[in-house]
Amino acid sequence: METRKGYQAIAKYLMVSPSKVRPVANLVRGKSYPEAVAILEAMPQKGARLILKVLKSAGAIALYVNRKLDEDSLYVSALTVDDGPRLKRVWARSHGKRDILLKRMSHITVVVDEKVGR
C-alpha cells in the first residue's frame, strides 16, 4: 500500500489564539481546493485570512512541484492548528496588584493532495 504525503505549507508564530482558528479550520478540512478557497474568502475572521494564505501557499507548492496538476484536482487532505509559545504580559489591577495576560500564538499546517479515484 502506497502512502501519500501531499504538499505541505506551514505558518508559525501567528498572533491569534488557536481556539479562534480551529473552528474555521474544521469548516475547510477535507474540502476540494477551490471550494476551500471560496469558503475562506467569504469569512470575516482573522483566522480565515491566515488559513487562506497558508492554503494558497500549499496549492502553489503543489502546482510548482508537479506541473501536471491543476487546482481542481487538489483537496485539503490535512489541516492542523497547533499551539505556539505564549507571550506573558502584565495587566495592572487595583491596590498595586497585577494579572498575567497570556497572548497565545498558533502554528498552522496545511497539506493538499491530488484526488485519486474519487
Predicted regions and their residues:
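Structured, basic alpha/beta domains of bacterial-type, RNA-associated proteins
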Residues: 2-15, 23, 31-118
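Short, positively charged, Gly/Tyr-enriched micro-motifs
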Residues: 28
